[in-house]
């Protein structure tokens, strides 16, 4: 298995430069639900990328894969759409790979895989003790 170079951006012109430089995957980071609580007080970057950014990046790149990290599994609220809608829109907007972060159960993974429904590659980000135990 070869090393895959990834670059996180929501700027199409930067994505094109990265792609030209040999980056294999352009990464759009939609994850924000609960992130401030999980990373509060830490010196970390919290992206505010959008589903519209997925489309803009998809339109800008030609050879790199488009990796999109969605939010952890969630239902719709007044503030955000459901996981199913977020995942479907990401794929419709050009995601080649959809990443599920911060999952804690097999049921969440099953829901994620069902929502993707083989329309894109999937990637699981193991970052909880519960995920490691699955």
Predicted ranges, named:
Residues 117-119:
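Short gly/pro-enriched beta-turn/loop segments at secondary-structure junctions
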